A protein has these predicted regions:
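Short, small-residue-biased leader/transition segments that mark boundaries at the very start
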Residues: 1-6
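Generic beta-sheet signal
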Residues: 7-10, 139
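Short gly/pro/ser/thr-enriched loop/turn and capping motifs at secondary-structure boundaries
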Residues: 11-16, 144-147
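A structural-propensity feature for long, helix-poor, extended segments
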Residues: 16-48, 158-164, 173-188, 192
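C-terminal domain-closing interface element
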Residues: 29-61, 188-213
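Conserved phosphate/anionic-ligand binding catalytic regions in large, soluble enzymes, centered on
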Residues: 39-49, 109-119, 139-146
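Active-site-adjacent helical/loop segments in soluble small-molecule enzymes
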Residues: 52-130, 187-199
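C-terminal non-catalytic interaction/assembly regions of soluble proteins
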Residues: 117-213
Length: 213
């Protein structure tokens, strides 16, 4: 059978909508989720795919990217959309992601991070939608230790009352996976920056920290 590329999104599902409709529209609310690396309105990688499905037409590619910049949206032709037939797209809500993390832990004892949770959720949707049971490897892109609170509260809400390093120790106990040295070292590392500022003060604060007038 043909190979499929499974494309997953979180609640910021601009890419899901693009693959479903052929229209890319960033004019929407930006949602903060527990999988922040996927919190996007503009996909930096999609431009390369657009170039390919436009027949390596740099001028067409530039036209669409200019539309995105000026209008916040663009649409591809039916001919271009046909070339996306090997892509399956879906998305995972915050609730679905948390449920996947919890179920996988309860079924296997393995704890995944929130981005892998999105992938695993969408993979299950893919299997349900297509009936394809091909053996599939999901490559985790991050350690659950980077997202201890989100991961553990998905397993049990009681963990939300614990401190950050208590959560690190609890994740170690539940998973049996060693605490990464970089995180272990934070326990005793001196706090270098403790400035809290408003968004409109960020530029001035960065300049001050760097000694730039």
């Amino acid at each position: 059978g043909s190979e499929m590329c499974i494309r997953d999104s979180n609640d910021n599902k601009v890419l899901y909508d693009f693959f479903a409709t052929g229209e890319y529209d960033r004019n929407r609310d930006f949602i903060l989720t527990t999988s922040p690396s996927m919190d996007i309105l503009i996909s930096s990688n999609l431009e390369r795919l657009i170039y390919r499905i436009a027949g390596n037409d740099a001028a067409k590619n530039q036209e669409l990217m200019s539309e995105l910049k000026s209008q916040g949206r663009y649409g591809i032709t039916d001919e271009m959309k046909k070339q996306l037939a090997d892509f399956y797209g879906n998305y995972a809500t915050e609730e679905e992601n948390a449920a996947t993390i919890k179920k996988l832990y309860e079924d296997t004892g393995y704890i995944i991070d929130t981005h892998t949770g999105v992938a695993a959720t969408v993979y299950e949707k893919y299997k349900k939608d297509t009936g394809d049971t091909t053996k599939t490897v999901i490559a985790s892109t991050a350690s659950p230790y980077k997202f201890t609170r989100s991961v553990l509260t998905a397993i049990d809400p009681k963990y939300d009352s614990m401190g950050d390093f208590e959560l690190v120790d609890e994740l170690n106990r539940l998973s049996g996976v060693d605490i990464p040295k970089a995180i272990e070292d934070i326990r005793t590392a001196p706090v270098l920056h403790d400035t809290v500022c408003e968004v409109n003060e960020m530029c001035d604060n960065v300049k001050r920290i760097l000694g730039i007038n």
